[in-house]
Curated annotation (Swiss-Prot):
Any one GO molecular-function label of the UniProt entry: undecaprenyldiphospho-muramoylpentapeptide beta-N-acetylglucosaminyltransferase activity
Classification via Pfam families: Glyco_tran_28_C, Glyco_transf_28
Primary location class: membrane
Lineage: Bacteria, Pseudomonadati, Pseudomonadota, Alphaproteobacteria, Hyphomicrobiales
Identification of the protein by name: UDP-N-acetylglucosamine--N-acetylmuramyl-(pentapeptide) pyrophosphoryl-undecaprenol N-acetylglucosamine transferase
GO biological process: carbohydrate metabolic process; cell division; cell wall organization; lipid glycosylation; peptidoglycan biosynthetic process; regulation of cell shape
The entry's keywords: Cell cycle, Cell division, Cell inner membrane, Cell membrane, Cell shape, Cell wall biogenesis/degradation, Glycosyltransferase, Membrane, Peptidoglycan synthesis, Transferase
Role summary: Cell wall formation. Catalyzes the transfer of a GlcNAc subunit on undecaprenyl-pyrophosphoryl-MurNAc-pentapeptide (lipid intermediate I) to form undecaprenyl-pyrophosphoryl-MurNAc-(pentapeptide)GlcNAc (lipid intermediate II).
Lineage: superkingdom: Bacteria
Annotated compartments: Cell inner membrane
Pathway given in the UniProt record: Cell wall biogenesis; peptidoglycan biosynthesis
Amino acid sequence: MSKGIVLLAAGGTGGHVFPAEALAFKLKERGYSVHLVTDSRAERFAGKFPAEEIHVVPSATIGSKNPVAVARSLWTLWSGMRAAKKLIQRLKPVIVVGFGGYPTVPPLLAATRLGIASMLHEQNAVMGRANKALAPRVKAIAGGFLQESGDVFSDKTVATGNPVRPAILAAAEQPYHPSHPGEPFNLVVFGGSQGAQYFSKAMPTAISLLDDELRARLRVTQQVRPEDMEMVRGCVAQLQMGADIAPFFNDMAERLAKAHLVICRSGASTVSEISVIGRPAVLVPYPHALDHDQAANAAALAATGGAKVIVQSELSPERIASILSHVMNDPEKLSHMAAAAKLAGKPDAANLLADMVEAIAAGKTVSEFKRTRA
């Protein structure tokens, strides 16, 4: 018999959906039924989500200064709140947990108005806009990189870390095996669940600048946006090198486990996953993030020695080629980085977050939960 329904709400990108998925698996193991509220974008990422049902509720972000656009967004949000209220009244969840992104706003607002226990999980070192708007209303906040002190919401914040999916935990069991000169070198390049156009343009040029011996060693996995596929495949064909190019990889965990180096953006889920697996990385924060959250996430891992952070404006193809030339001939350096990344990982974050969800659902305060952890 189910202990009750937990309703999870997450924006439709991998950065929001993947940690929600990790929590869902833990809650299912503990006897709960899980439902997910998200948007249509999540279809690519929610294939393995262990939800009884996935619900799409109208939502919108208010990012425009156009009065007509703002009015439409407010109408959509109001419609979403009505739909979320009906959904919550039907499901009667024991708690509603939001993972950020604008699709979380209607169900969390509805839950707080209906008196249902509610909490947030913030993946980043800087709280996103949706979570920031909801934070005063919810009972508790779990943080991936948030601190438990020095913030207006610190009295109800617990630093749980970011939960990672079972596939990542399985990959973490594989030790790092360095690539020595003359041996194949697995390079994984990606820009988060939605890809990164910058890497599509920079990486082929960088690889073309390597000497023949190094290029022959490379085995590249690169995530590429659909609109860039033809261009990147053409470049790879000209270079006559081994490469897997795709808009999305369902087996990314296994590819990360085999990687000798990762070059990627620094979204919270990405940083958490590569640290749990323990792989050396060059992190390139997304330069147009409103709150510079990726820069803060990257700095957290770089401080441990597990990653090197380079801002995009300073990362030319020539510099990428130079980095590859050095590290491909320095397996000891990469091994040290891999070990440092592994030490920074929080593989038990999903268990801790599930403990917190159960505590808040049972009516405990954050202070009471913290005392049980002490």
